[in-house]
């Protein structure tokens, strides 16, 4: 793979394949400010322009309509910034530069100017061999994922005011049957639904962050990569000392679990001289540490990335002789796993709550108020019944969880095929498809949009797709439309992540309304090139008649596309943390 600022050109495309563009640039002709003789392309006739012979700049100059441009070959090892410095010092008269490099050069060479663009919107990408089609598909998916999820890596410590200002609540959790999982494209889990309800009360977007292990949950919290941890975490003396713990929302017993075929073990005294397996970061370790010497058992440590549900599976398979688990998790596990049994509680009843940093007093107060109002209420009871009391649901959901080998949708193969052709991440298209139709190929909207991707019949005809209710054709139409809209926003000034968000908004409300919103954002002093907090805010104003009448494309019920982009972004972020690219 060639990773660098590699422009996609006709000559290069004959020899190698390219990834989807990572950005777009303008190619600028550059001279000194004192040189006023060069103002337009025609002025290059008979002039000497210094560029690398093998560069895309040389290719563009040779393809120019102006005859007589003389290319002076610079050393292939010479970087564009070095060439710009030579022009600034008067050692060369004219060169060509990407717009982003030119902007950087002005900081140390203010005597440079660009009189005109040689090429506009030149795509920059990674290069690879044409035979590496699988690698290209993986790179394309990665580039979409990186663009849309790069904010997940950002670390900042925020209390309530900052969370509301950013309009995002980052919740740290784990991918388990009792916390958060994906089932047939839908985001589910007891902790997830509680967190979503809390985010709704704050009026912010929920962002789920899944650290690589249980141990890393609190490490992420301390480093500012999340605002709170919601993963069925018990109140322990050590956690009370180091963190701010919320009011409890569950009370559980810590149960000793053995294989069902072990009929001799009736309680802890029967494990004298034997081992109990737990994670060191778990509350179980603290509980057992207080009594192991007295009762004569040993503690064996499990890997930190092993979840309690996986531990119970190993107990059932006879690989682990004894382990510990919270009573609610055991209750859920027993709906589909009859190979384990509980031999009773160890210690007192334990409180379960969310964990925050001690520098978040306002957030803790808000969470406590939420928990006290939530506990034993209608929504809470519904969630407990949904996740811990329904054996039929438990069995079906666990067998089809995306992280357990199930599919995101019934159409993963078709989505992968078409997304690959159009350089999109199949998980993004699946998130969009769920938003459009909940995976119903016969869905028809009130305005007549049809199929899995809810494409209008007239648009389907333009895209040369005949039967939108056929899953293969319906997905193809939606992917084609997303690719078309993505290409409308390939300005160098628009970040890759926002090109995708603009394309999603265009899919929902049309590119005309998005263009109107971008212009309105500029008039409001906002960025016309960023979606969240900028163009989305302007788009909402197009729902006001007095503002919409001044817009080229008029009135728009634009709360829908704003929610559409936000919900797909959220769903996609969750998909990529659980389901691999391939």
Feature-to-residue mapping (PLM):
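Short beta-strand->loop
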Residues: 17-24, 28, 72-73, 110-120, ...
């Amino acid at each position: 793979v060639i990773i660098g600022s590699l422009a996609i050109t006709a000559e290069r495309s004959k020899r190698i394949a390219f990834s989807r563009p990572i950005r777009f640039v303008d190619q600028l002709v550059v001279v000194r400010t004192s040189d006023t003789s060069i103002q337009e392309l025609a002025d290059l006739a008979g002039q000497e322009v210094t560029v690398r012979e093998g560069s895309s700049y040389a290719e563009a100059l040779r393809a120019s309509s102006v005859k007589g441009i003389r290319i002076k070959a610079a050393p292939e090892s010479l970087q564009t910034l070095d060439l710009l410095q030579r022009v600034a010092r008067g050692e060369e008269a004219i060169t060509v530069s990407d717009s982003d490099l030119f902007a950087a050069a002005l900081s140390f060479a203010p005597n440079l100017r660009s009189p005109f663009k040689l090429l506009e919107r030149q795509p920059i990408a990674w290069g690879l061999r044409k035979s590496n089609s699988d690698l290209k598909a993986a790179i394309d998916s990665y580039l979409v994922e990186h663009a849309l999820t790069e904010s997940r890596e950002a670390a900042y410590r925020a209390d309530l005011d900052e969370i509301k200002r950013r309009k995002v609540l980052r919740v740290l959790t784990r991918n388990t049957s009792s916390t958060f999982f994906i089932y047939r494209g839908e985001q589910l889990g007891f902790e997830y639904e509680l967190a979503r309800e809390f985010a709704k009360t704050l009026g912010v977007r929920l962002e789920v962050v899944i650290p690589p292990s249980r141990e890393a949950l609190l490490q992420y919290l301390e480093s500012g990569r999340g605002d709170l941890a919601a993963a069925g975490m018990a109140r322990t003396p050590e956690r009370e000392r180091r963190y701010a713990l919320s009011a409890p929302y569950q009370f559980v017993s810590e149960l000793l679990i053995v294989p069902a075929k072990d009929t001799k073990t009736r309680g802890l005294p029967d494990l004298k001289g034997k081992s109990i397996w737990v994670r060191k970061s778990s509350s179980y370790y603290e509980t057992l540490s207080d009594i192991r010497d007295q009762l004569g058992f040993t503690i064996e440590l499990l890997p930190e990335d092993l979840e309690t549900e996986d531990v119970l599976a190993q107990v059932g398979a006879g690989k682990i002789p004894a382990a510990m688990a919270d009573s609610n998790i055991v209750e859920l596990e027993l709906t589909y796993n009859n190979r384990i049994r509980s031999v009773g509680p160890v210690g007192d009843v334990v409180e379960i709550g969310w964990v925050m940093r001690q520098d978040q007093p306002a957030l803790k107060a808000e969470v406590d108020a939420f928990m006290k109002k939530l506990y034993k209420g209608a929504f809470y009871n519904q969630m407990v019944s949904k996740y811990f009391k329904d054996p039929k649901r438990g069995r079906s959901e666990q067998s089809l969880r995306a992280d357990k080998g199930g599919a995101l949708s019934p159409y993963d193969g078709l989505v992968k095929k078409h997304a690959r052709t159009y350089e999109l991440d199949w998980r993004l298209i699946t998130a969009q498809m769920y938003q459009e139709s909940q995976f119903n190929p016969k869905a028809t909207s009130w305005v007549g949009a049809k199929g899995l991707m809810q494409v209008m019949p007239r648009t389907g005809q333009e895209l040369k797709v005949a039967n939108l209710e056929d899953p293969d054709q319906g997905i193809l139409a939606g992917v084609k439309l997303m690719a078309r809209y993505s290409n409308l926003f390939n300005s160098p000034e628009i970040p890759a992540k926002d090109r995708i968000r603009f394309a999603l908004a265009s899919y929902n409300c049309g590119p005309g309304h998005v263009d109107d919103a971008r212009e309105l954002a500029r008039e409001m002093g906002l960025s016309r090139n960023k979606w969240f907090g900028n163009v989305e805010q302007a788009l909402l104003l197009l729902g006001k008649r007095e503002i919409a009448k001044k817009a080229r494309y008029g009135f728009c019920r634009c709360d829908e596309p704003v929610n559409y982009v936000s919900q797909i972004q959220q769903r996609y972020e969750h998909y990529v943390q659980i389901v691999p690219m391939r």
